[in-house]
Amino acid sequence: MIFKIRWIRHFLFFFTISVVFAKEKGHSFDLKKLDLAFEQNEKKLSHSITGNPRSLRAWSKRGDMRLFLGKFEDAKSDYEKMIQLDPALEVSHWRLGIAYFYLEDYDKAAHQFQIYHNFDAVDRENGIWRFMSQFKSKGLKTAREGLLKYEKDDRPPYPLLYEMFAGRLKPEDVFLRIEQANYSESFKERVLFHGCLYVGIYLELVDNKKIMAENLLKKAFENKYGQSTGTYMWQVARLHYFQLMRENKTSSMGKDSSGK
């Protein structure tokens, strides 16, 4: 009976995803060209920093370029330099928290997202990253007990996503609710980017469904809104997707070599 229920849930999840993304087609993207642009910008910003080592903008932008290149340690150093130059920036520096997360310094990441809550008590995306950090360092129970509290509304689909991370909404229901909202096509594409990114991460972390997670993160990476805007979080989605894809491939190769 338990197996049957799980099978039905998996069927419903894949059915929901197929309905929501029925019109979506694959998108090609020149990653080498993207990395080259980041490398060139990194060099220009390094030159700017040499000429003006107190330029917060240059440290900030170079930190971004380095993070987008997957140079998390270097990005962290640049972001921390900003705070050294202007300590008032610490409370609002969520990007530093993301660098800490990918460096697996989860306690520092959780702290950074915690203090950001004092700066912006509406942004549930920040609360999700704190959950992710606490999940990595202390497990699901502590992560859920430590979920930040929000009273004001937030942009879609973050209220839905936050309910999912709290354990009060199933991943498949996030996409059902998005489909039922009757957003315009362009706005729906934007909402789906965020939905795919964080439902994917939820499946990876909480449900340990790494292949399903990879499929959703691929959709976040290929999302038309994400690719056309190239936002900071699309860059994070891109990095996370390829990181998980490599991990899944390594895991699969390990199973093949063991004969299991």
PLM region descriptions:
Residues 47-48, 81-82, 115-116, 220:
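Canonical positions in the second alpha-helix
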Residues 68, 102-103, 136, 205, ...:
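Register position in tetratricopeptide repeats
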Residues 64, 98, 132-134, 201-202:
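Residue-level recognition of tetratricopeptide repeat
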